[in-house]
A protein has these predicted regions:
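Redox- and metal-dependent alpha/beta enzyme cores, enriched for Fe-S-associated oxidoreductases
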Residues: 75-76, 81-111, 277, 281-352
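Gly/Ser/Thr-rich loops at beta-strand to alpha-helix junctions
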Residues: 71-80, 147-153, 283-290, 365-372
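Glycine-rich, highly charged phosphate/nucleotide-binding loops
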Residues: 115-133, 336-349
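A charged, amphipathic alpha-helical module
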Residues: 2-69, 190, 194-317, 336
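Acidic/His-rich segments in extracytoplasmic proteins that coordinate ligands and/or metal ions
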Residues: 126-195
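Hydrophobic alpha/beta core scaffold segments
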Residues: 295-309, 320-330, 334, 339-423
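An N-terminal, globular interaction/scaffold subdomain
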Residues: 51-120, 129-133
Length: 423
């Protein structure tokens, strides 16, 4: 742990005078970690989840290794067309998580606030903006984002486009779920195709795009089946694997690597032992850095996180033969688009599929969408027979504190569910 802290301080300090050196150090440190994921894997995890750790690290390294082939995206932007022109997508939430895991987030949060960014803005976005402003993040080829679910996107990506002076494309997703709105978004995605072809200099084959959408559909179907099968199984889990799935099941949809991960899950679950302890379904992001949460839910036979809503935000009910409409449908009918009730109902449905005994609604600092829906969520989950704990905190900024309260409230919740029955 001391090594990680020292590494983070070096990265933070170098950005003040030598941002290129800081970037090299960050890249080198992450490459070393990737070698560990590849050759010194955590044997407590299932093989699929070990593969996922390596896949996620590859995704975060690419913008540092080949920034000219990278595109900054918002988390729920469909990325199949970007993959088709050879761009590697990476997102604010994923990259900021890795900076936080490297204990290098504090200087970037402060940088963003010093530049006038509100303290109440999501800490993932502040960390990413600060890292860009201090020169740690290299210039991407372009930026593609959507207004879907997160209002911070509107500030962050316009600011980044102005800062880097790169082409930017915004996708407007209406609130209501209608055929007309699907068509409206599909037309924008056709414009995105033209945008990418113009700025990258490559042609996007519609037949190849259809193949990618077929792959995306299979991937989502595999993951849904896995979540159903794990209901009566014990799957050892840490706090980052559910987040990895939440990232890759969005920005890597359409890739063979992500489909391979879901295929491995289906093989692994066949060999998993019978369920042990209590199953917890997690709504929104996970404070992976929290010792209090780690103590209760990391590799514990008494209670495990069996799913995170970020990995199950859309259904595989689209037609790949109409690729633009298929991607548009994923966005318009996204579980976090529209009224909070849609999100809550999707969470209840997915929690029950995974055999959850209870759920945690994590009120991440600055996320109005989540904070505002908390009381309604508690009412609806408990009416559906699922006890729900509302837990406030920060998924990225460890200086947010509140560890004592987190430990007390989470411990009491699990004890109420019976998680301590074998003590």
């Amino acid at each position: 742990m001391q090594i990680i802290e020292t590494f983070g301080h070096y990265v933070e300090n170098l950005t003040n005078t030598k941002p290129d050196s800081a970037r090299w150090l960050l890249k080198t440190g992450w490459e070393a970690q990737n070698l560990k994921f590849r050759y010194m894997q955590d044997k407590r995890l299932m093989p699929a989840d070990r593969h996922l750790a390596n896949l996620m690290m590859d995704t975060m390294l690419r913008p540092l290794q080949k920034p000219e082939d990278s595109v900054i995206v918002s988390i729920f932007t469909p990325c199949e067309m970007m993959q088709e022109v050879g761009l590697h997508p990476y997102n604010v939430e994923g990259f900021s998580c890795y900076l936080s895991a490297s204990k290098a987030e504090r200087a970037f949060l402060q940088q963003a606030e010093n530049q006038g960014i509100a303290e109440t803005l999501c800490s993932y976005h502040k960390t990413f903006l600060g890292a860009a402003q201090k020169g740690l993040l290299p210039k991407p080829k372009c930026i593609v984002y959507t207004n879907l679910t997160c209002d911070a996107n509107l500030l962050t990506f316009r600011t980044l486009a102005d800062f880097y002076q790169v082409p930017v494309f915004a996708i407007d997703v209406p609130w209501n779920q209608t055929k007309e709105n699907v068509q409206y978004v599909a037309d924008q995605l056709r414009d995105l195709k033209v945008f990418l072809e113009k700025n990258i200099g490559k042609t996007i084959s519609e037949d190849r795009l259809k193949e990618r959408l077929v792959c995306s559909k299979r991937t989502l179907e595999n993951y849904r089946k896995y979540q159903q099968l794990r209901a009566d199984r014990y799957v050892p889990s840490d706090l980052v694997t559910p987040l990895y799935a939440g990232m890759t099941n969005n920005i890597l949809l359409g890739t063979a690597e992500e489909e391979k991960y879901t295929q491995m899950l289906l093989e692994d679950i066949k060999k998993a032992p019978a369920a042990k302890g209590k199953h917890i379904y997690w709504m929104h992001t996970i404070p992976f850095w929290s010792d209090a949460v780690r103590q209760e839910l990391c590799f514990s036979e008494k209670a495990q996180i069996v799913g995170c809503e970020l990995a199950e935000t859309c259904e595989p009910d689209f037609d790949p033969e109409n690729p633009f409409e298929a991607m548009a449908r994923r966005m318009v009918y996204h579980s976090l688009n529209g009224s909070a009730l849609r999100r809550i109902e999707a969470g209840i449905r997915h929690a029950k599929q995974a055999g959850a005994d209870g759920a945690v609604w994590f009120g991440h600092w600055g996320c109005k969408h989540t904070l505002g829906a908390a009381q309604l969520a508690k009412k609806k989950f408990e009416e559906a027979g699922l006890p729900l704990l509302i837990l406030d905190g920060d998924g990225c900024d460890r200086s947010h504190g509140g560890e004592g309260q987190t430990s007390t409230r989470l411990g009491a919740f699990l004890e109420m569910l019976g998680g301590a029955e074998n003590e």
